[in-house]
Amino acid sequence: MSMNSFGHLFRVTTWGESHGPALGATVDGCPPGVPIEEAMIQHWLDRRKPGQNKYTTQRREADEVKILSGVFEGQTTGTPVQLMIENTDQRSKDYGDIKDKFRPGHADITYFQKYGIRDYRGGGRSSARETAARVAAGGLAREAIRALAPNAQITGYMVQMGPHRIDRARFDWAQIEQNPFWVPDAQAASDWADYLDGLRKSGSSVGAVIEVVARGVPAGLGAPVYGKLDTDLAAAMMSINAVKGVEIGEGMAAAELTGEANADEIFMGQNGPQYSSNHAGGILGGISTGQDIVVRFAVKPTSSILTTRKTITKSGEETEIITKGRHDPCVGIRAVPVGEAMMACVILDHLLLHRGQIGANRGHIG
């Protein structure tokens, strides 16, 4: 098994490499009758595409999506939807000097150890370029969610860059689209711009923490033990390039709390059960509660930096390497729309699973 697919009923297979002619996604299991046009998916791809500001890689890709199958007269047909994005701005010559060297911090060495061959041009399949296909699939998932959970909204934003965190007291949803970092804190966005400018000019990089919230998701999604909603969300986020950690709700900080502080107390509201807090991140026992679903993931610093580092060649000789090419000083910036896309795919998948198992019937309280 090559493990290029994810999902249960809404199943996404991505394909293509960083410097190949194209990449894309084959989406199987999308319900029929979902209104979809290329422009709807393009909207989400435009938020991720490179070269939009000085804080991301200067590789210039239009990232124009083409729908090749599964859509007729502006609606999905229920058959596989094929999405393709052409690569147009590859500079493979930037990687000629490292074709026999392994870049520290990259997947070069592990791909070679596993397969005995690797595409050294931009990392091939291990490149974050692959995530464009995920965002395209996520755009389709968002449109399908509208029909099944019309109140659902999925929003991602950065909450930490290097050692610098947002001030939750200044959290403003309206600020997220107003700065290049997708930060809900205007002061943090300004401070981070100065911080990243210094790192970028020095040729270094930095990690980040991204938070993705799904609001308006109904209670009841997910299943006990091995079909947990948070299991699939954690796996989806962990599969994103450079991700080294995932948290749901309070996450690791829950270990510092007492039982009294961590348990979200329940009371009856006008529209059913309500909670005094959301330490659980909208999921209990692997099943959604109806509260906001909150997921965070941490991305490591970009490994491609302009500092000379020690490494080895394919023949085992010790040497040094300097990475050329165009790279993100903070991959967390463009990971925001990727995290949103993965959230959308998982939520839709579980909406379909829930509908298939339970239908319209649910436990009613009050």
Curated annotation (Swiss-Prot):
Q: Name one Pfam family in it.
A: Chorismate_synt
**Binding, FMN:** R125, S126, S127, N241, A242, G285, K300, P301, T302, S303, S304, R326
Q: Does the keyword Amino-acid biosynthesis apply?
A: yes
Instruction: List the GO cellular component terms.
Output: cytosol
Keyword Kinase carried by entry: no
Q: Which UniProt keywords apply?
A: Amino-acid biosynthesis, Aromatic amino acid biosynthesis, FAD, Flavoprotein, FMN, Lyase, NADP
Write out the pathway annotation from the protein's UniProt entry.
Metabolic intermediate biosynthesis; chorismate biosynthesis; chorismate from D-erythrose 4-phosphate and phosphoenolpyruvate: step 7/7
**Cofactor names:** FMNH2
| Lineage: superkingdom | Bacteria
| A GO BP entry | amino acid biosynthetic process
What catalytic reaction does the record list? 5-O-(1-carboxyvinyl)-3-phosphoshikimate = chorismate + phosphate
Task: Write one Gene Ontology MF term.
Answer: FMN binding
Binding-site list for NADP(+):
R48
Q: What is its EC number?
A: 4.2.3.5
- Report the cofactor remark: Reduced FMN (FMNH(2)).
> What InterPro entries does this protein's entry cite?
Chorismate_synth, Chorismate_synth_AroC_sf, Chorismate_synthase_CS
- Which family is this sequence assigned to? Belongs to the chorismate synthase family.
This chain's function reads:
This reaction introduces a second double bond into the aromatic ring system.
Complexes and interactors: Homotetramer.
The record's annotation in HAMAP family points to: Chorismate_synth (MF_00300)
**What name has this protein been given in UniProt?**
Chorismate synthase
Q: Which organism is it from?
A: Ruegeria pomeroyi (strain ATCC 700808 / DSM 15171 / DSS-3)
Q: Which gene encodes it?
A: aroC
